[in-house]
């Protein structure tokens, strides 16, 4: 099923595909048990390659900055995390501040899972 289309026909799935390897790499470096989507986005932006990828992703979507970031925070990054075997979705993180989407809680898989 074709998803939402950005400018020039780019899809959420295409942008997620481009970010997946970086997301997986960052997940392997995380410590702790749980994090929210916005916490992960903050981590993503804390490294130069992540900052460049984040900016490239919302710009590639092609709408105004706020609308494009809504797609990245609410669809692309959650899709990356759902695709990963390194984390599981644990529910919405109501009360967590993210001006672009309702963040979720994610649990890191134990090394034996």
Predicted segments, located by residue:
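Phospho-regulated, low-complexity intrinsically disordered regions of nuclear gene-regulatory
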Residues: 2-26, 38, 43-113
């Amino acid at each position: 099923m074709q998803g939402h289309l950005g400018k020039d026909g780019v899809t959420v799935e295409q942008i997620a595909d481009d970010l997946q390897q970086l997301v997986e790499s960052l997940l392997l470096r995380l410590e702790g048990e749980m994090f929210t989507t916005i916490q992960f986005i903050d981590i993503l932006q804390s490294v130069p390659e992540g900052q460049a990828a984040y900016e490239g992703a919302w710009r590639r979507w092609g709408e105004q900055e706020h609308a494009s970031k809504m797609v990245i925070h609410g669809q692309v990054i959650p899709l990356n995390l759902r695709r990963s075997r390194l984390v599981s979705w644990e529910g919405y993180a109501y009360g967590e501040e993210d001006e672009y989407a309702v963040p979720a809680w994610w649990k890191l898989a134990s090394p034996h899972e």
